[in-house]
Amino acid sequence: MSQVALYPVALLVQKFGGTAVGDPDRIRAVADHVARTVKQGNKVVLVVSAMGKETDSLLRLADDVSSTHPGREMDMLITAGERKAMALMCMALHDLGLPADSFTGSQAGFLTDTEHRNARILNVRPDRVRVALDAGR
C-alpha cells in the first residue's frame, strides 16, 4: 500500500535583508525560523543579504583604497559581504541539525550579462540547487 502525502512539499524561497541578519543573534533567529519551516515539511531556498551595514562599509573601504572603482571589482567586493552572511547562516543551520550549502549567484545557476553593478539575468540553471535540495541540504 502506498502512502500519499496529504499536503505536497512546498518549495519556499525566503529572503532576509541586512537588518534581519545584522548580528549573530539575528542570524540564529532566522535559522530558527527556517528550521521550523523545514520541520513543517517544506523545502527552503534561503537568500540573505550582507549583514547590517556591511555593504556600506565595503563601499567606504573601496573609496578609501582607490579613486577608481572598476565595475567587476566592485561586484566582487560587494559579494564578499553576502558570502560572509551566507556562510554564517549555513553554520547556524548546521547547529540546528539542518545541513545547508551556500551558493553564490553563479554557483546557483544564474547567468547574467556583463553590465557590472547593474547586471540582468539572462538564464537560470538551478541544477546544483536542485541536487542540494534533493539531498536534504
Language-model regions, residue ranges each:
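Nucleotide/pyrophosphate-binding catalytic subdomain
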Residues: 1-137
